[in-house]
């Protein structure tokens, strides 16, 4: 019996592979547990179509991330904060503040994507890493000024 594996099965194969198994093992274990599906032409074609659609979506998402990277790297965000002596900020710049400032420039992303190497506690120019996903990282320029 030929089956299409719906998940990785140790000692048999990886998800998406078509493997030959004994009828009892295929019917009573793999198919019964939802680990595989009988490999008919219809099932194989449906699976391949799903794979193509997933690849197209991933490519589209990657293109959007590349565009977002270009937008982020072309920006210089200016944040105005209250300062004390020696241009020291009251508090520090947070990821949330950076995310909100980015939204003003029509760049919407979650604060968890922003990485601040060291706490920003004084005025000046800084660079912050933004991890967009799929290995795409952008460098955002920050300018912190006194209010």
UniProtKB/Swiss-Prot annotation:
Name assigned to this protein: Large ribosomal subunit protein bL9
Gene: rplI
Cited function: Binds to the 23S rRNA.
UniProt GO molecular function: rRNA binding; structural constituent of ribosome
Gene Ontology process terms (BP): translation
A Pfam family: Ribosomal_L9_C
NCBIfam families, sorted: L9
HAMAP family: Ribosomal_bL9 (MF_00503)
Protein's UniProt keywords contain Transferase: no
Keyword Metal-binding applies: no
UniProt GO cellular component terms: ribonucleoprotein complex; ribosome
PROSITE patterns: RIBOSOMAL_L9
TM region(s), chain numbering: none
The entry's keywords: Ribonucleoprotein, Ribosomal protein, RNA-binding, rRNA-binding
Similarity-based family: Belongs to the bacterial ribosomal protein bL9 family.
InterPro entries, A to Z: Ribosomal_bL9, Ribosomal_bL9/RNase_H1_N, Ribosomal_bL9_bac/chp, Ribosomal_bL9_C, Ribosomal_bL9_C_sf, Ribosomal_bL9_N, Ribosomal_bL9_N_sf
């Amino acid at each position: 019996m030929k089956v299409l594996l719906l998940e990785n099965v140790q000692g048999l194969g990886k998800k998406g592979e078509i493997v030959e198994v004994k009828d009892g093992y295929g019917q009573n274990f793999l198919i019964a547990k939802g680990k595989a599906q009988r490999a008919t032409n219809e099932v194989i074609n449906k699976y391949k179509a799903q794979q193509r659609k997933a690849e197209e979506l991933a490519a589209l998402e990657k293109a959007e991330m590349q565009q977002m990277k270009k937008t982020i790297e072309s920006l210089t965000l200016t944040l105005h904060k209250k300062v004390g002596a020696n241009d020291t900020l009251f508090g520090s710049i947070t990821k949330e503040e950076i995310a909100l400032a980015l939204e003003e420039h029509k760049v919407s992303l979650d604060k968890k994507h922003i990485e601040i190497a060291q706490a920003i506690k004084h005025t000046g120019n800084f660079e912050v890493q933004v991890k967009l996903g799929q290995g795409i990282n952008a460098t955002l320029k920050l300018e912190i000024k006194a209010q």
